[in-house]
C-alpha cells in the first residue's frame, strides 16, 4: 500500500521550494536482457549475496509526461511538508520528475531513481553552487533531501573544533570481511578501500596475534571470531593499515576510528596485542592517535584514532601523563541493547543474537532507539582536556549487524537485507525531533553497505551533520559580534 500524498523532508540548511512535478507512465515493455546484470546475479550466488533489485528505467529528457503541475511548495530547513499532491494518478508504478528551486538555482530529481548515481539531483542552473541528494521511500511516497557531500572527503566541510563524538559517522562491522568466505563469516560487500571512498570513517577490526611471544614479529591476522576472513589464505592487519594510511595521505582532512579487538584461536593475551600495536604500529610519530580522550577533528585529521577493546600493559597506563593509552572500550557489554563502557566514553547498542528471523524487528527497534539517544545530544565545540571531561560527551556506537551462524535466514547478509533499508527509512522519515539538539546519528556500524553501489545509508548518515554545521556557523557569527 502506497501513501496517498507526497511528502517532502528538507534535511539541509537551505530553504527549498518545489516548483513543478511531471508524471510518467511506467515502461510498458520489459527491458532487454542485460548480460551484465546476469553476470552480476551469478556473482551474487558465488559471493553469498542474496539481495537483488532490478534497476528502474531512466526518464530521458525527451520523454513527454502524461501530466504536469506547477506548484509553489516551500520547505524550510529541517522541516517536513505533507503535500496535497497525490502519489500517483493511474498506477503506483508511475514515475515522477521533481523540479526544485533554492537560492535562485533549479534542481531536478526523478523517483524512483533508476540507479544509485541519480540519487544526486541534477542541477539545471548554470554554475550551480548547491548540491542535493534525494532518497525516496516508495511505500511512504516520501522524499528526503540532503546536502550532497563528497563522500571521499566529507570531513573537510567541518571545522577543526568539532568533537569527533558529535559527528554522524558511517561505520562497518568486521570491516575487512569482503573476501570469499563462509556466509556466516563474510560481512561486507566491498573492500575497506571502497568503504573509505564512500564515506565510512569507523572500522571494526578483529585480529589474532600470530607470534605473540616474539617481540620482533608484528603479524596480526584478520579474523572473525575464530575464523580467518578468507578461504584463500590469511589476510593481515599490516596490509589493511597501509591502505588506510594511503587514503589519509591523499585525504588529509579525514580521520578513521579503528575499534580493535583480539579474537581468533591460540594462546595470546590482550596485553601481548597492546605491545605489538605499540611497538610495531602506533609508534611515536606514526599516524595513530592514542590519547585516551575523545579528540576534535583538528586533533584527529590525517590520523587513525584507536578505540581499544583490549586490556593494556601496565606501562601503557602511565602514558599521556598517567591517563592511559587509547580510547578505552574494555568492559564492552555483550549482546546489549543499551550499555555504557566503564570508561564512560562509549555508549553502545550491540544486540547480535538474532536466533530467529522474527527477531530482526527487535533488532531494528534497538537500532532506532539508539539513534534517537544520539540525536538528542548537543556537544560543545573545542578541545576538551582529558578522558574525564569527554565522559559527558561520549560516542554513541550503534551496530546494525547481527547473525546466527547456524540458521540460513539469519546470516549477516540476510540480516542486513532487512535492517539496512529499515534504518535508511527511519533516518529519512523520523530521525531528529528534539529542538535544540544536533540530530546526530552517532556511529552506525553496518554489514553489506555499498552492495551494488547502494550507498544511500552512508549518504543519509553523513547528511545528518548539516544541523551541527548550522549551529557551528551561528556560534561563530555570534562570537564575531
Range-by-range predicted roles:
Residues 2-198, 211-250, 312-314, 403-481:
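Long, acidic (Asp/Glu-rich), low-complexity accessory segments flanking structured domains
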Residues 151-355:
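Chitinase-like catalytic core of GlcNAc-active glycosidases
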Residues 258, 284-299, 399-400, 446, ...:
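A generic structural motif
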Residues 291-434:
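Surface-exposed substrate-engagement region within the catalytic domains
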Amino acid at each position: 500500500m502506497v501513501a496517498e500524498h507526497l511528502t517532502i523532508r528538507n534535511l539541509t540548511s537551505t530553504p527549498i521550494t518545489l516548483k513543478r512535478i511531471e508524471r510518467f507512465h511506467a515502461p510498458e515493455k520489459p527491458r532487454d536482457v542485460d548480460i551484465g546484470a546476469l553476470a552480476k546475479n551469478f556473482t551474487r550466488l558465488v559471493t553469498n549475496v542474496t539481495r537483488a533489485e532490478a534497476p528502474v528505467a531512466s526518464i530521458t529528457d525527451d520523454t513527454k509526461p502524461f501530466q504536469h503541475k506547477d506548484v509553489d511548495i516551500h520547505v524550510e530547513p529541517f522541516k517536513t511538508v505533507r503535500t496535497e499532491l497525490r502519489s500517483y494518478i493511474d498506477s503506483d508504478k508511475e514515475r515522477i520528475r521533481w523540479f526544485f528551486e533554492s537560492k535562485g538555482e533549479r534542481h531536478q530529481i526523478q523517483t524512483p531513481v533508476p540507479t544509485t548515481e541519480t540519487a544526486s539531483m541534477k542541477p539545471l542552473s548554470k554554475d550551480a553552487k548547491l548540491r542535493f541528494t534525494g532518497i525516496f521511500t516508495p511505500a511512504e511516497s516520501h522524499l528526503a533531501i540532503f546536502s550532497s557531500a563528497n563522500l571521499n572527503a566529507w570531513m573537510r566541510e567541518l571545522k577543526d573544533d568539532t568533537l569527533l563524538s558529535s559527528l554522524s559517522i558511517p561505520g562497518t562491522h568486521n570491516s575487512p570481511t569482503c573476501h570469499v568466505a563462509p556466509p556466516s563469516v563474510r560481512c561486507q560487500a566491498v573492500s575497506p578501500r571502497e568503504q573509505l571512498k564512500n564515506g565510512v570513517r569507523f572500522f571494526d577490526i578483529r585480529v589474532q596475534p600470530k607470534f605473540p611471544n616474539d617481540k620482533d614479529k608484528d603479524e596480526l591476522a584478520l579474523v572473525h571470531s575464530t575464523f580467518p576472513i578468507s578461504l584463500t589464505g590469511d589476510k593481515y592487519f599490516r596490509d589493511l593499515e597501509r591502505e588506510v594510511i594511503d587514503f589519509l595521505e591523499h585525504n588529509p582532512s579525514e580521520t578513521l576510528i579503528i575499534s580493535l579487538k583480539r579474537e581468533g584461536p591460540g594462546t595470546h593475551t590482550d596485553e601481548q596485542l597492546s605491545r605489538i600495536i605499540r611497538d610495531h604500529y602506533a609508534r611515536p610519530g606514526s599516524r595513530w592517535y592514542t590519547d585516551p580522550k575523545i579528540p576534535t577533528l583538528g586533533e584527529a585529521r590525517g590520523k587513525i584514532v584507536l578505540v581499544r577493546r583490549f586490556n593494556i600493559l601496565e606501562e601503557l597506563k602511565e602514558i599521556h601523563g598517567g591517563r592511559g593509552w587509547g580510547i578505552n572500550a574494555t568492559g564492552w557489554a555483550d549482546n546489549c541493547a543499551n550499555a555504557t563502557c566503564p570508561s564512560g566514553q562509549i555508549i553502545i547498542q550491540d544486540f547480535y543474537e538474532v536466533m530467529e528471523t522474527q527477531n530482526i524487528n527487535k533488532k531494528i527497534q534497538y537500532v532506532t532507539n539508539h539513534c534517537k539517544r544520539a540525536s538528542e545530544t548537543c556537544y560543545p565545540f573545542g578541545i576538551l582536556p582529558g578522558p574525564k571531561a569527554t565522559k559527558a560527551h561520549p560516542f554513541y556506537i550503534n551496530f546494525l549487524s547481527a547473525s546466527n551462524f547456524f540458521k540460513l535466514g539469519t546470516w549477516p547478509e540476510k540480516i542486513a537485507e532487512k535492517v539496512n533499508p529499515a534504518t535508511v527509512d527511519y533516518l529519512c522519515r523520523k530521525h531528529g525531533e528534539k529542538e535544540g539538539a544536533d540530530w546526530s546519528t552517532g556511529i552506525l556500524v553496518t554489514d553489506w553497505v555499498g552492495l551494488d553501489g547502494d550507498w544511500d545509508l552512508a549518504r543519509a548518515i553523513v547528511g545528518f551533520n548539516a544541523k551541527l554545521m548550522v549551529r557551528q556557523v551561528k556560534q561563530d557569527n555570534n562570537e564575531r559580534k
